[in-house]
A protein has these predicted regions:
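Short hydrophobic beta-strand micro-motif common in sensory/regulatory domains
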Residues: 225-227
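Short hydrophobic alpha-helical segments used for membrane anchoring or interfacial signaling
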Residues: 34, 74-80, 162-170
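Extracytoplasmic/periplasmic sensor domains and loops in membrane signaling proteins
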Residues: 45-62, 67, 82, 86-117, ...
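Membrane-proximal N-terminal soluble sensing/regulatory segments of transmembrane proteins
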Residues: 45-50, 134-141, 162-168
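Short, small/polar residue-rich loop motifs at catalytic or cofactor-binding pockets
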Residues: 68-71, 124-125, 221-223
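Juxtadomain coupling helices with adjacent low-complexity linkers
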Residues: 151-181, 246-249
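Conserved beta-strands of PAS-like sensory domains
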Residues: 123-156, 230-248
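Juxtamembrane extracytoplasmic/periplasmic/luminal helical "stalk" adjacent to the first N-terminal
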Residues: 1-48, 65-72, 156, 160-162
């Protein structure tokens, strides 16, 4: 009884900690996006004024070198829904609004949107900011960040082993261009620094047993908890956290 209470307390504390890390990252992503959307050089990029040496990739590199955010992506879309710049790839000039419902909504009714979503590259934090020039709506800036700073924090500072498994619903769309290129039993794994040991262990198990965890599970000397990653009432992924019970205080 005492032991189960202890495990319940640890689980509850971890859930609070991780939800707090997620909210912090969401807000930081929004702060970067809001600042950048006001920048005149960002606005000029919509008009393809590439003769300037302004490149958001350099900002992404600076964030990588000086902050915990190692893979910040910037995406600029014009007011007709065409992608004019992606910092992480050379791909551009595609009419992205044709396959993005969220974009169609914002182009019709420009407003700030801050969310977690799954695209063709990854599960990401995404802040979408309408851009105006001389009070005229000219496009959208997206600032996109990943879950890796959160899972690194859990591994390095909390001594936990996290793995993020994106819902099977999104597996097919992630196959070709996924950020981590890691798949486990038909699930996309979203954290680059996932432990090989955990991958091997889960590959030998019935994954569904872990994805059904409501509170916690004790198995093979591990305390395992599952934190669903939700957006607008839809489950996008499960974050499983492993902690060796022999290392618990």
């Amino acid at each position: 009884e005492l032991l189960s209470q202890k495990y319940s307390n640890i689980t509850s504390n971890l859930q609070d900690k991780i939800n707090s890390l997620i909210e912090t990252k969401k807000n930081a992503t929004l702060a970067i996006a809001l600042t950048l959307a006001e920048n005149d050089k960002t606005k000029d990029m919509i008009f393809q004024e590439r003769n300037s040496d302004y490149d958001l990739n350099e900002l992404s590199e600076k964030l990588k070198n000086y902050t915990d955010y190692k893979n910040v992506w910037f995406h600029i879309i014009d007011s007709s829904g065409v992608s004019v710049y992606r910092s992480w790839t050379e791909d551009k000039n595609d009419k992205i609004k044709n396959y993005r419902l969220d974009l169609q909504e914002i182009l019709l009714n420009p407003k700030v949107k801050n969310s977690i979503s799954v695209g063709i590259y990854d599960i990401t934090f995404k802040s979408m900011i309408p851009i105006y020039k001389d009070e005229k709506f000219i496009g959208i800036l997206e600032c996109i960040t990943h879950f890796n700073s959160i899972t690194r924090e859990l591994r390095n500072n909390q001594m936990l082993e996290p793995i993020i498994l994106v819902d099977k619903l999104f597996t097919n769309q992630l196959r070709e261009n996924s950020f981590t290129k890691i798949f486990l039993q038909d699930y996309y794994v979203a954290n680059l620094s996932v432990s090989n040991e955990i991958l091997k262990y889960l590959d030998s198990q019935d994954l569904e047993e872990f994805l059904k965890i409501k509170d916690y599970l004790i198995k093979d000397e591990n305390l395992v908890i599952n934190i669903p990653i939700m957006e607008d009432g839809v489950k996008l992924a499960d974050m499983l956290i492993f902690q060796n019970i022999n290392k618990l205080n």
